[in-house]
Amino acid sequence: MFRVLSLGGYVAFDLPRVVTGLGAILLVGVAATHVYVLATQPAQGALPWYLAVYAAAVIAGCLLVGLALWVGRNPHVAQVGWYFGSLLSVVVIGVDLLTRVVYLPALTGMTGRWDFAPASFAFAFAGAFLALHTTVLLGINVAYPQRQLWED
């Protein structure tokens, strides 16, 4: 199964800084969508306290993990950042699906609505980060601090 998922090892990219930078940018995208929600939704009606706390935690987490990926001088920090970024992405996707399927107090307008653009963008950014990290784990992409020592 691994051989199929990793495309037999025939497709691989050795761009560790680009892949790591893309991962950081995707996490900043998740944070930006939550900043947008916090900035625009109070004007339309009061946000429930638990959504504001969740959004603030996601913003802080995404920015910290993105900073760890982008600036992490210690290779261990960057590697751990990928796993925390994936964990954060799974949480964002889970909460996104939960708020659209399950009725939550003070979020009745969100239940059943799949056209709320900020949530869709956060879902897409988090999903893209998970997909990118999966390609790193499968060896298709290389992320900092790893390098491929290929010789032709």
Regions found by a protein language model. Give the residues of each.
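Membrane-interface extramembranous regions
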Residues: 2-152
